[in-house]
Amino acid sequence: MIVRNLEECRKTERFVEAENGNWDSTRLVLADDNVGFSFNITRIHPGTETHIHYKHHFEAVFCYEGEGEVETLADGKIHPIKAGDMYLLDQHDEHLLRGKEKGMTVACVFNPALTGREVHREDGSYAPVD
């Protein structure tokens, strides 16, 4: 069994901040835990917009605090997100993620699992898993 504390992990290398300041993420479960997925708690900062296109990963996201929105670029549809909502990027959907005035905190599951140091590349993706 693995037990980790969010606040303790935020003081370690498991805490990752976006270079542009749009978000921070605490990676609680990673590829080296050998369970086939990763689990993160991510804070989307207020008033930000992040281009994301996970070409090599699937992601499920559950918002448990705050508000934001996801705009799918293929069709321009805007999906408001609030506490209690989830969305699943099951088609490698290219999208814009926006934090509203208070931002939002989300729980994210990735498959394949993240290694822990990923940051979004220029095209919005994470590098493929080796």
UniProtKB/Swiss-Prot annotation:
GO MF terms, alphabetically ordered = ectoine synthase activity
Q: What class of enzyme is it?
A: lyase
Which UniProt keywords are listed?
Answer: Lyase
| Stated role | Catalyzes the circularization of gamma-N-acetyl-alpha,gamma-diaminobutyric acid (ADABA) to ectoine (1,4,5,6-tetrahydro-2-methyl-4-pyrimidine carboxylic acid), which is an excellent osmoprotectant.
Q: What is its EC number?
A: 4.2.1.108
On whether tRNA processing is a keyword of this UniProt record, the answer is: no
Q: What's the encoding gene here?
A: ectC
Q: Which CDD domains match?
A: cupin_EctC
Q: Which reaction does it catalyse?
A: (2S)-4-acetamido-2-aminobutanoate = L-ectoine + H2O
Family indicated by similarity: Belongs to the ectoine synthase family.
GO terms in the biological process aspect are: ectoine biosynthetic process
Say yes or no: keyword Lyase present.
Answer: yes
- Kindly give the Pfam families that the UniProt entry links to this protein: Ectoine_synth
Please report the name of this protein according to its UniProt entry.
L-ectoine synthase
**According to its UniProt record, in which pathway does this protein act?**
Amine and polyamine biosynthesis; ectoine biosynthesis; L-ectoine from L-aspartate 4-semialdehyde: step 3/3
HAMAP family from the entry?
Ectoine_synth (MF_01255)
Organism from which the protein derives: Chromohalobacter salexigens (strain ATCC BAA-138 / DSM 3043 / CIP 106854 / NCIMB 13768 / 1H11)
